[in-house]
Structure formats: C-alpha cells, structure tokens
Design a protein with these regions (language model features):
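A short, well-structured edge-of-sheet supersecondary motif
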Residues: 68-91, 312
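Small-residue-rich helix-loop
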Residues: 88-90, 359, 366-517
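Conserved serine DD-peptidase/penicillin-binding transpeptidase domain
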Residues: 54-66, 113-399, 482, 505, ...
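Bacterial N-terminal signal peptides that target proteins for export
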Residues: 15, 22, 26-40
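Bacterial N-terminal signal peptides
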Residues: 39-48
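Short hydrophobic alpha-helical segments enriched in small aliphatic residues
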Residues: 6-13
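Short active-site loop at a secondary-structure junction
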Residues: 90-110
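Sec/Tat signal peptide C-region and signal peptidase I cleavage site
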Residues: 49-53
C-alpha cells in the first residue's frame, strides 16, 4: 500500500501490492497511537478487494498484529526457525537488543562447552582454609575462595558448609589472630561494566567475588513499632541502620532502603502500618571476602576458638595481566597455591548451571563467567568474554550480532540480535551436551514460566530463558507446536515504556506461532 497525503484532513490512497515484509514492519513499528489510528483503516481498506484476490493473513501478519498491541514505542525483534533451520518468521532479525537475563544462555552454554566434569563433584571450585604464621604469635586464619557460588553458613547446611572449615580450624588450634577472607583467585572486579549504580545496594547488584557466602546477601526483617515511631529492624550487626521509616495507623507497607557503595550504614525510609505483617529485606554485600571473614569469626567463637585480631579481606587488584589483549592470547600466569588445612568439595556444577537458568541467579552467572575465564585466563571478565566469543564463533554466530560486558545480563551494555541467539540455540541442539543444557531452561507451567504458559497450549511444551531489565523483556528457546514440530525462537522487546510490560504481547505472539504450526 502506498498513501499520498494532500490536505491535512484528507488522505489520497493509491493501492498497490505491498511485500509482506513491509506490511509486517508497518504493523510492528507503527507505535504512535495517532499513527496507528491512521494506518489501521488503511490496512482494512487494503483488504477490500474482489473476493478472488483476497489472501489469508500470513503467520507474520498475525504475529505482527499481536505485537502491535504492546505499549506504544516498544521495539521488537523476533526470529523463529523450523527443524531445518528455515526462518518462518523474521522481524528485525539483525537489529541488536539489550538481552537482559537472556545473557545467561550464552554464559551457561560456554560453561557446558568448555568445562569438563560438570556432572561430577567440583573440588576445583571448593573453598579452603589455611593457617598463616607471621612470627611467634597466634596464626592468622585465611579463608580462600575459588569461585564457588554455593558456600553456605546456614544452620541447616548439609553440603558445602562454612561450618566444616570452622571445625577444621577448631580441631587444630584454640587461638587465632586475624581472620582474613581471600578472594584473589579472581581479580577484583566486583561489578561488570554497565551495572546500574542503584542496583548495587540490593541483592541484584551484590558484589562478585571468588569468595562468596550465602549468595552475598544479608537479610533483615522490619516490624511495625509504636504509632508514629520508627519500626523495629532485626538485622545482624554487619550493617547498622539509619532508621527513618515510620509506623503509621493504616495503609500498605512501603519500605525502601539505600546505602553508599562500600559503606556499612543502611538508610531505611517509608512506612509500615500497625498490625502489618513483617517486611523482609535483602541487602547486597560490597565486600564478600570481608563478609565471609566476619561470619567465620562468629563460627569460630561458637566453637570456643579465641580471635585476638581483626577481620579483613585480601584482594588482587585488576592489572594489565588480566587483559588477554595485552597478553596477546598467552595464558595467564598461575602462581602456586598455598596448601590448605581443609577444603570443601561442592556439588556438581550442573546443579548451579540449572539454578542460573531456571532461577535466573545473577551472582551465580557472573561467577560462572569467571570460572570459564580461569581455564586459560586469569578469572577476569575480559578473559571470560574471550571464551564466550570463541564458543559463539564455533556456533557460527556473526561477530556483529552480540556484545557482552557481564555474564548475568545486569549490564545495560550487552547486545544480542535475535538471529544470533537462534543460531546459537540451533547449534546447542546439535552438541552432545545440548539436551542437558536445554534441561536447565525454565519450562512452561513451571518456575519462572508458570504464570505465563501454565494452562496454555505450551504448558510443558516451551523451554526458554526469560529476561527482564529496565525497558526490556526477552524470551528465547524451543517450543513444541500444536503439530508436534520443534521450533527454535528468540524474541526481544526493548524501549518498553516505564511502568508497562511487553510480556503479554510477546507470549500471545509465541502462542500464535505454536498454534499455526
């Protein structure tokens, strides 16, 4: 359809046959409500042709119409391929989008492709403890991390427990000096480029460290106090609270918190009503190595071990040696590791890879990128990016179709084209580990996709990684259609207006594809 505009209130239309791709682009990219109101009658007029010339809407037309119901301004990219690799839908296939947590697909695929023995216990990643003697005094205790994401200090811990290391120290000595958390296995890069500063105080932006404990989070509970007074806050003494919140007579609970980077004072604001249920909060940790030392001192004291010194952290500053470009591809130097008094053996990495994709655990994903980085590099983000690029080159993904700055998708610098994502997904399906990787994805009707596909035609028939970030929604994976076909797809929505979501339109589009195949 071509339209020529004359007077402001008249529309002179000359009808021609328009390629489907142009019509679908109009349907998807016409976001302004005013333009939509102008274009919609034209699309209807375009169908007012003799009966013999009418054509049924194509699948792309149907999907484009669904996506056009998303909030105005949303930009979509979608690629769907059949079993042979033929693209049956292609909308902005090579445009680059912020992928949000779809980034985790690329991180976990690299881990499957490069790490050996992921279905076996993981002694290489286990946390260790050693005693360091400096002169004739009591030895210092050093807890050394090697990138394990699942170390726990919970009272009910059964595997990978910090308490086991405290038992080993208590069996060796009853007096120690300083307690030091050592995360120098990786260089000190606690946040990736492009991390939003406002996320840092939260669990979503907690620091990344080779020595990680309890997901690098600290919980607190806020309970209503007397009317007009600050609420009560139950919080371990790692942080102190600047309590500016108020107990009110009624209304919904609205509690917010903030904290300066590397500070230990949390500012609490907002309101909680009399009789309201307690409000749980989760705080991020900026220095996980120090946090682990703090917690380890408590465990030692509970075992009767006297600590005469202080708690501290030992970091390895980022240096030129952590940049593979400066090393010109040479492996990173590996200084000899000190002997440990005791070392834990975490559960198989496949369990953590499942957590990363199904739960979308940011910290674990960024630690996995660094684990991959240590194979030939230093544990730096840059070395991890080299590993991801090498995997994508093997998968046949064009270099122009991606850029990554972290392993989790929290960075706003990440970019992926839908065609690149589908190319990787199809390659994964051909790998010996492809079925195991697919099993780590959320499943329709369960977990993160329970509310989105439960009770639909794709209930337990879609296996896909979700993604949500500011102004971004994403979903990529595999679906089993009404006709029993297995399709590979990737759909991104960017520039979603604040306070809205494109998820509903995306899910209807995916269901439309499944119903038509």
């Amino acid at each position: 359809m071509r339209a020529s505009y004359g007077h402001a209130n008249t529309l002179n239309v000359r009808w021609t046959i328009v390629p489907e791709a142009i019509r679908s682009t109009v349907a998807v990219m016409t976001r302004s409500p005013l333009v939509r109101r102008a274009v919609a009658p034209l699309l209807l007029l375009g169908t007012a042709v003799p009966l013999g010339a009418q054509q049924a809407p194509s699948l792309t037309d149907k999907v484009a119409a669904v996506l056009a119901t998303a909030p105005a301004g949303t930009r979509f990219g979608l690629v769907v391929t059949d079993e042979s690799g033929r693209e049956i839908i292609s909308i902005n296939p090579d445009q680059r989008f912020i992928p949000a947590s779809n980034t985790k697909m690329f991180t976990t695929a690299t881990a499957f492709d490069t790490l050996s023995g992921i279905d076996q216990p993981d002694p290489a990643g286990g946390t260790g403890v050693r005693l360091e003697r400096n002169g004739g005094g009591a030895p210092d205790v050093v807890i050394e991390g090697r990138g394990d994401a699942r170390l726990s200090s919970a009272a009910d811990c059964k595997v990978d427990c910090l308490a086991e290391l405290a038992d080993a120290v208590a069996a060796k000595t009853r007096v120690v000096g300083n307690v030091i958390g050592d995360d120098s296995w990786f260089p000190d890069e606690r946040w990736g480029p492009g991390m939003s500063w406002n996320n840092i105080p939260t669990r979503s932006g907690t620091g990344i460290s080779a020595l990680t404990l309890d997901d690098n989070e600290l919980g607190a509970t806020v309970t209503a106090g007397a009317l007009g007074m600050p609420p009560k806050v139950d919080l371990p003494d790692y942080y102190t609270i600047d309590n500016r919140a108020v107990t009110v007579a009624s209304g919904e609970t609205h509690i917010a918190f903030d904290r300066d980077v590397f500070a230990y004072v949390v500012r609490l604001t907002g309101t909680i009503a009399l009789g309201a249920k307690p409000e749980p909060l989760r705080f991020g940790i900026d220095d996980p190595a120090r946090f682990t030392a703090w917690r380890f001192r408590q465990l030692l004291a509970a075992r009767g071990v006297r600590v005469t010194g202080t708690i501290g952290a030992r970091h390895r500053p980022l240096s030129p040696a952590d940049d593979p470009a400066i090393r010109k591809g040479a492996p990173a130097a590996r200084p000899p590791a000190p002997e440990a008094l005791a070392r834990l053996t975490p559960a198989p990495l496949i369990e953590d890879l499942t957590i990363i994709n199904k739960v979308s655990q940011n910290l674990h994903a960024d630690l996995m990128l660094r684990r991959v980085s240590r194979l030939n590099g230093s544990g730096s983000i840059a070395d991890g990016q080299v590993a991801v690029r090498a995997m994508l080159a093997r998968a046949g993904v064009a270099r122009t179709e991606f850029d990554f700055s972290d392993g989790s998708g929290m960075s706003s610098y990440n970019r992926v084209a839908p065609r690149g994502a589908v190319t990787m997904l199809r390659w994964i399906a051909t790998q010996p580990w492809g079925a195991a990787w697919r099993a780590t994805l959320p499943i329709g009707g369960e977990g993160g996709l329970a509310k989105r596909y439960g009770g639909t035609a794709l209930d337990h028939k879609i296996f896909a990684k979700t993604g949500t970030l500011n102004a971004t929604n994403a979903l990529s994976g595999y679906m089993i259609t009404k006709g029993g076909r297995t399709l590979t797809f990737s759909i991104f929505a960017n520039d979603v207006p604040e306070g809205t979501s494109a998820i509903a339109a995306m899910d209807r589009a995916v269901l439309t594809v499944a119903a038509e195949n």
